[in-house]
A protein has these predicted regions:
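Amphipathic, non-membrane alpha-helical segments in soluble helical-bundle scaffolds
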Residues: 149-156, 177-184, 203-210, 229, ...
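Beta-strand/loop-alpha-helix module characteristic of Rossmann-like adenine-cofactor folds
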Residues: 2-4, 8-13, 21-24, 31, ...
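Amphipathic alpha-helical interaction segments
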Residues: 29, 49, 161, 182, ...
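Charged mid-protein connector segments
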Residues: 226-272
Length: 272
């Protein structure tokens, strides 16, 4: 607002560190307004200095993430991760907490401040200590190197890779010979075992049995993919579309007056 007030009376030069189109929210806000003309003049991106200082090649894949606004599900740990805008201890703590959901406490991360300048500071620390003695600076980034697959076994894509391997040319003979028909009895068996775990109110057992049931879904999906008919993405997409369609009171503008009204509309939608 201050800039827009001043530009009413005079032309302004608004200078930012690095390239104006890189991680500069104020520049984006200025470009969105239509009352005044904005000319963007390029500068050297600080990412160039960052890659040089860290000695990494972005061709291997990297994600550039705003440390003040991101969701854990967006992170691709197979790539180089660079968190920008980590300008104080509170943001560093948020980044650390999110990463600890997926990575071990001792995983190495690198704090880099003022990359490429005479004041450049680089320090590699254990993830669990990322926010300890953090120096406040608006030129600080955090680098997370690519994570090995065995650290990511709780991610869905790793499960998919494992099932593909089991069904692949060098996979398990038992898994490779299975068909939709041969797996039918196992699907039924796993459902009953899940019901028993629920009856016992055993959370650990429920987790295990849900995994066994998911295995059946993954095997059937891989069989479908191997035959060229469908993939797990088709299964997920079909389910997601169905849930959105059958919940117009959540994802649309429909209103419900009672649980009986909800049940009635649900049954009507199922018939279509």
């Amino acid at each position: 607002d201050t800039l827009l007030q001043r530009v009413k009376n005079e032309s302004l030069i608004y200078a930012v560190p690095g390239h104006p189109m890189l991680a500069e929210k104020t520049v984006q806000l200025l470009l969105q307004q239509t009352e005044y003309e904005v000319t963007v003049l390029g500068g050297q991106s600080y990412l160039d200095d960052l890659f040089t200082s860290l000695k990494i090649d972005p061709i291997d894949g990297f994600q550039f993430i705003d440390g003040t606004s991101f969701e854990r599900r967006q992170l691709d740990y197979r790539s180089h991760l660079i968190f920008c805008q980590v300008y104080d201890q509170f943001i560093a703590s948020d980044v650390k907490i999110a990463l600890l959901e997926d990575l071990p406490p001792h995983y190495p991360v690198t704090i880099i401040d003022a990359a490429g300048s005479e004041r450049e500071r680089i320090e590699t620390v254990a993830l669990e200590t990322l926010d300890h003695s953090f120096i406040q600076s608006n030129l600080t980034s955090v680098y997370v190197p690519p994570v090995q697959s065995y650290e990511l076994n709780h991610h869905f894509y790793r499960l998919k890779e494992v099932i593909q391997t089991l069904r692949g040319p060098n996979g398990c003979p038992w898994d490779r010979k299975q068909t939709h028909e041969s797996l039918r009895e196992y699907a039924l068996e796993e459902v009953y075992e899940l019901i028993e775990a629920i009856h016992l109110e055993d959370d650990e057992l429920i987790v295990e049995e849900l995994g066994d049931l998911l295995l059946q879904v993954m095997l059937h999906s891989q069989i479908g993919e191997d035959a060229g008919y469908f993939t797990i993405d088709d299964v997920i997409g079909t389910l997601t579309n169905k849930m959105i369609y059958r919940h117009p009171h959540v994802f649309g503008d429909n209103m419900i007056e009672s649980m009986s009204d909800l049940t009635k509309k649900w049954e009507q939608l199922k018939q279509k």
